[in-house]
């Protein structure tokens, strides 16, 4: 029997809030076919995750879940049940135009992105999460969840309410400022409307009292992910004065009232329950591994290639934790809309740092591996899978275009990788176009100042890693029969143009290769041992 660990800040026994009620109901659905365990988020450690690495994790409210545990969870099969906009620092999208927060307000994107699925309650809730995070693993229930006991209470009170109302307007009394009691009272006073305040910690008593009123004044001050109160009020026959923060009001069935609404809610909940169980049951079929990889793309003179690159990264059979973009300043990318890129972080520079800049940015990665791509490089769907398999037997700097020097000048070399499509792993002197390496090896690149900042970062990286870390360089298999394993599938189409550094007018062809010859000779002079034993 599969094991499911449900992680949340509080259980329903501690706090009977909307999120906790949803969690309790979904957890009860899983009890029939799974071994389940509830864990308080504040008590979960990385050891907890390691000891249950083969389990399925479902994360609900996670304020008290440590960042380290969140990071570690991204190596597992986990779902998120989203409550209260924990992808925003403010926990509320309502102040922002079209409910889209500025990028500096968005948080936890990689945690949401790397979940198998993110479950949202109302349809509008799911749309808002998707627009802010720009992720494609959202599932909206179009409903929330009530226990059978609570459904029975609603049905009894709906029946009683249909016989007539005895009271006029009600405002829910709450110490929670975001529930808008003060604003609702101010509204009634401004409109010279009478009202009563009401609260009751017992659900049955609360709904019975609510059903006595003809109207609910409810003006929540944050964007509610559903608002069960609004639905309950309409089921027991209340008209409503509300605001745009009630996301349940956007559901097509919200216009119903009384028992008609209750019956529709039952159908919607049943469909949502089936959807939830189907997704959890199918996790092994639908799950794509997430590896501890940070991707760094480079934007320079081919910005229009970047959406295609991002799409290729997102289609990898083994996905990275995050995608970053390093932008070197150039007039060719000035007008490109960076906001449309589906990436996690952008280094938007006002200077052209050339080839080394992205490797400097890579030092900020907090993952085991880093993958760097030139702006003309589109990987096959299994490139990361290929690299990780290669690492098991040939740990080293990996790349999609390998170079084996035949002399002490760069132009005299043999190639492997996508240009020649090698069947087996090949040891090479350097790689380019796409790099895959352990982040810890970046330290070697910066041990010595390179002979030039204008060229040869690929040569210098392999030389420095070999000299200071004993790290070799390899080209993974690029079999002709399986381009999905290739590090570049459109190299000829995208890379041979006037914008290539080796061809363009800004750097003459002769100057480019003269600089590379100098970098090669400097490396050999200072101890670089090439595959063919090249000497000066």
What are the roles of these predicted feature ranges?
Residues 113-138, 182-183:
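A short, active-site helix/loop in glycosyltransferases that binds the activated sugar's phosphate group
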Residues 144-206, 302-304:
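Conserved catalytic-core segment of nucleotide-activated headgroup transferases in glycan assembly
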Residues 362, 378-450:
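Conserved catalytic core of nucleotide-sugar-dependent glycosyltransferases
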Residues 286-291, 305-309, 448-536:
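C-terminal catalytic/acceptor-binding lobe
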Residues 1-65, 241-270, 277-297, 307:
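N-terminal pre-catalytic "stem/leader" segment of glycosyltransferase-like enzymes
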């Amino acid at each position: 029997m599969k094991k499911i660990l449900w992680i949340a800040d509080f259980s329903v026994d501690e706090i009977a809030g909307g999120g906790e009620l949803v969690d309790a109901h979904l957890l009860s659905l899983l009890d029939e076919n799974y071994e389940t365990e509830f864990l308080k988020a504040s008590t979960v450690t990385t050891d907890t995750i390691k000891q249950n690495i083969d389990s399925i994790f479902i994360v609900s409210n996670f304020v008290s879940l440590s960042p380290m545990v969140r990071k570690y969870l991204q190596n597992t099969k986990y779902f998120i049940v989203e409550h209260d906009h924990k992808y925003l620092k403010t926990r509320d999208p309502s102040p922002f135009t079209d409910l889209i927060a500025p990028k500096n307000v968005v948080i936890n994107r990689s945690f949401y992105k790397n979940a198998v699925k993110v479950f949202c309650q109302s349809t509008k809730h799911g749309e808002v999460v998707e627009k802010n995070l720009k992720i494609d693993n959202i599932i909206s229930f179009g409903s929330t969840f009530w226990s059978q006991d609570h459904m029975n209470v609603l049905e009894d009170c709906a029946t009683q309410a249909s016989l007539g109302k005895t009271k006029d307007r009600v405002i829910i009394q709450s110490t929670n400022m975001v529930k808008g009691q003060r604003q609702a009272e101010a509204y009634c006073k401004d409109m010279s409307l009478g009202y009563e305040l009401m609260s009751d910690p017992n659900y049955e008593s609360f709904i019975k009292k609510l059903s006595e009123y003809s109207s609910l004044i409810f003006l929540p001050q944050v964007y509610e992910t559903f608002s069960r109160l609004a639905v309950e009020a309409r089921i027991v026959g209340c008209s409503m004065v509300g605001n745009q923060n009630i996301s349940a009001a956007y559901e097509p069935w919200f216009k119903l009232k009384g028992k008609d609404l209750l019956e529709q809610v039952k159908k919607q909940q049943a469909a949502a329950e089936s959807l939830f169980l189907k997704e959890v049951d199918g996790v092994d079929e639908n799950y794509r591994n997430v590896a501890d990889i940070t991707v760094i793309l480079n934007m320079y003179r081919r910005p229009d290639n970047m959406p295609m690159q991002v799409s290729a990264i997102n289609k990898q059979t083994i996905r990275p934790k995050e995608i970053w973009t390093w932008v070197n300043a150039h007039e060719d990318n000035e007008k490109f809309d960076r906001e449309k890129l589906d990436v996690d972080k952008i280094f938007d520079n006002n200077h052209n740092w050339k080839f080394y800049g992205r490797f400097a940015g890579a030092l900020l990665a907090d993952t085991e591996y880093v993958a760097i791509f030139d702006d003309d490089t589109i990987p096959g769907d299994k490139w990361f899978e290929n690299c990780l398999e290669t690492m098991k037997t040939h740990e080293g700097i990996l790349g999609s275009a390998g170079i084996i020097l035949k002399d002490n000048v760069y132009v005299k070399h043999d190639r492997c990788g996508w240009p020649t499509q090698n069947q087996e792993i090949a040891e090479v002197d350097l790689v380019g176009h796409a790099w895959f390496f352990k982040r810890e090896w970046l330290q070697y690149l910066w041990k010595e100042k390179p002979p030039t900042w204008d060229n040869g970062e690929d040569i210098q990286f392999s030389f420095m890693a070999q000299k200071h870390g004993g790290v070799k360089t390899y080209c993974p298999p690029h079999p002709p029969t399986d381009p999905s394993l290739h590090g570049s599938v459109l190299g000829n189409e995208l890379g041979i143009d006037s914008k290539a550094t080796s061809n363009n007018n800004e750097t003459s062809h002769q100057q480019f290769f003269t600089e590379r010859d100098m970098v090669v000779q400097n490396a050999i002079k200072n101890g670089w041992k090439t595959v063919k034993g090249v000497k000066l």
